[in-house]
Amino acid sequence: MALYNVDGIVIRVRNFQDADKIVVLLTREEGKVEAVARGARRPRNRFAAATQLFSHVRAQLFSGRSLDTLSQVEIVESFRQLREDLVRMAYATYACELVDALLPERQRQEAPYLLLLTSLHLWGEPDRDPEPLLRAFELKLLSMLGFRPSLAACVGCGSEAVQQNGGVRFAPVLGGVLCPQCTDEGEGALRLSLGALETMKRLLDGDIRRAHMVRLSGELAAEIDRALSAYILARTERRLKSKEFLDTLRSAR
């Protein structure tokens, strides 16, 4: 079996056999990889702390036929502060599940790794609003993976999506906004106000470290949530449990 080294973030963990864990890492070098951590469910095991969700690690793995094996691991950043704050933990958990749902295994692409790592650090800062950061994360991740929504040109014909009555039609399945002539083609299309559209553009193209400066509240936040939730559902083809939990938390605040 070949050995290889990675910098990675734990994005999913599940129990395996009597005392092991299977961890999914989003890595800088290899993309998304899955490995077994022997004995990691035992409290004093050398892998126990490093295999918690969100952990940023440097790891050495054995490459196996069907499943790789964790050989050595060093914690770079535990992101303990995220696990100690229920709301911020919910945002970060959803981000990890979204990466896991959208990214195929072994697709070597550094950008999603760097995006998630930066976002985890930002969610860990208590003075930052986690909501606009999440929307920026979703939009940027989609764009990196080839799912960039069309927010200016009509996704049906390519012409400029002229606003009507202060908004445009957004077709989640087709992949973006529609011009008046193509509106009938967009099954399940949603209305987006001009404010929501411009906010999405700003979050998509702006620096994610400044996303917290975008104010999202009330109907504007609800509009963007409906649009992006439908857009992501059309690509994952399943509802993410962590998103449902996050929605429950937000509705109770």
Curated annotation (Swiss-Prot):
Gene Ontology cellular-component terms listed: bacterial nucleoid
Keyword list, A-Z: DNA damage, DNA recombination, DNA repair
Gene3D superfamilies: Nucleic acid-binding proteins (2.40.50.140), Recombination protein O, C-terminal domain (1.20.1440.120)
SUPFAM superfamilies: ArfGap/RecO-like zinc finger (SSF57863), Nucleic acid-binding proteins (SSF50249)
Function: Involved in DNA repair and RecF pathway recombination.
PANTHER family: DNA REPAIR PROTEIN RECO (PTHR33991:SF1)
Family: Belongs to the RecO family.
Organism: Symbiobacterium thermophilum (strain DSM 24528 / JCM 14929 / IAM 14863 / T)
Covalent S-S links between cysteines: none
Keyword Hydrolase: no
The name this protein goes by in its record: DNA repair protein RecO
GO biological process: DNA recombination; double-strand break repair
InterPro entries the UniProt entry points to: ARFGAP/RecO, DNA_rep/recomb_RecO_N, NA-bd_OB-fold, RecO, RecO_C
Domain of life: Bacteria
